[in-house]
């Protein structure tokens, strides 16, 4: 598969909403030349979708017609019919994609063009409403609509009857973070999913998103607090901004509670954490996987953030950092992802009393750098394993997280990246913290493990 979006929008949409969806329908408003940073090209070329591309620039439209099988309209979309002045910007490179209707461009956008030294050419172009185009071509049921027109998005959407024209998923350019866009989409029956670059993703409230990531969790029979921790864990996953597939492994013949959703495995024997996680992998059916201890909590946007990084960077693995917490109540009070720069990396353990720190990791026999790790499921193919046998003789090939960074980067020659952010809270205790190693410099460790620092 060859994706063409600027920041992984097309792969995100495929994996989260349209896996296996062939023969769908798209609308691309502001399609430019149909190739450069196109959000719709992949769906037309690789998934057999049909649709409508709209582009007012004559030079870009000529290329669009040459490379795309879609219906291609050379017109500007707004909330009225007629003609208007359209500013074509040219600062070289890709800056023509910053062109737009003169009376809809944000003043900050014009300042940006000035800073770029962009040459401006004013064209008189035909203008039409989006629903006029949809009516003309009989497009009433639309899987995906991309609107990126440098400032006219809000007026176009205000004018569009979304009860008459059923659109499952939108990506909408919001270059300057106008809060009115989210308010409008909620009022029209859409749920905000996430922002990718400057595109905001919305899905229709009755259109389900597909889980892209399986989250593996071991539930220990000997943990006397497992019931409360399990409820907190399940609630934390349910609060993620994108859906996930939970997979729980219970050992010691412990029965899962009836209220627990997700996939469950019960093992009769006691398991190590690596045995439990790798047993859970047998049930994983999503492209991405991550582990999450029963007492740890993810930021509400953590799964979405790590997913888009994997897709944008075309990496096999991404790691982030945790905030160290010393009580379950503190751990449960999780915040959205934020920069790791505000918390120190402390290689020595324990830290000084009262120190708020983040979880680094080391190179000893246990632990990996970036303990909050999401990886592509296919990264397990060809990875070294050691064998663990179930009592009935079934052999499982398992891999602990000891070698994962070096296995992925050196043995499999795959790309691994580190997100320099706090993606959740890690429940720990100074006397038992295992992931810290003595005298490990953070940047040296990143270099040693072959990571790309984002």
Feature-to-residue mapping (PLM):
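Phosphate/nucleotide-binding beta-alpha loop and adjacent structural elements of enzyme active sites
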Residues: 1-211
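A recurrent flexible, glycine/aromatic-enriched loop bordering the glycosyltransferase active site
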Residues: 115-121, 343, 348-375
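Short, acidic, metal-binding catalytic loop of nucleotide-sugar glycosyltransferases
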Residues: 232-244
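Glycine-rich, basic loop-to-helix element that forms the pyrophosphate-binding segment
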Residues: 268-283
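Short aromatic/hydrophobic "clamp" motif used to bind/position activated sugar donors
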Residues: 289
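Conserved donor NDP-sugar-binding/catalytic core segment of glycosyltransferases
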Residues: 303-338
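Active-site donor/metal-binding and catalytic loop motifs
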Residues: 323-325, 329-330, 419-437
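Acidic donor-binding loop at a coil-to-helix junction in glycosyltransferase catalytic cores
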Residues: 395-404
